[in-house]
């Protein structure tokens, strides 16, 4: 991730508005702030109780806005499953799956980014980061207004992971169809034994956009 941020700065990319979907405790935003301290930040996190871990950011920086909601393709209220780790809680589980595993479910509001930012006076997002525990494509569909406008999308994709619907292949094809090119891989996630490649974190940039045009083949 550090290499990617350094590349952005070397290419003269200066984002004015950054969206963090699945902000959790704000760790990703904290790192982004070190590189882009003057940007506006819009944070979405369905676990409203995690806001307390970000109060220091929210209280000292009025350019950071926090929304205690999930992001998806459409607006509504959906069952959110609470699991052992707060960074793995998800809208992905069915009622039956949650009951079988002994997990609690609560109903939480979900918004499409298209609607959340519809009347916003903030600049169009330059970077949209998505960590949606396997539902990244649904979130992207709800952010379709920004295809062709937002320069950078950062998303997760499953590799060996058969649970996530957003496989590497599906995500590459989806972004290609919407005129985005794979630009960087910022993380290779190997959390289990055997040490297989479970997830990757990918960066896509707009085809023929600012960043894509800077790379000379």
Predicted regions and their residues:
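Phosphate/nucleotide-binding beta-alpha loop and adjacent structural elements of enzyme active sites
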Residues: 1-217
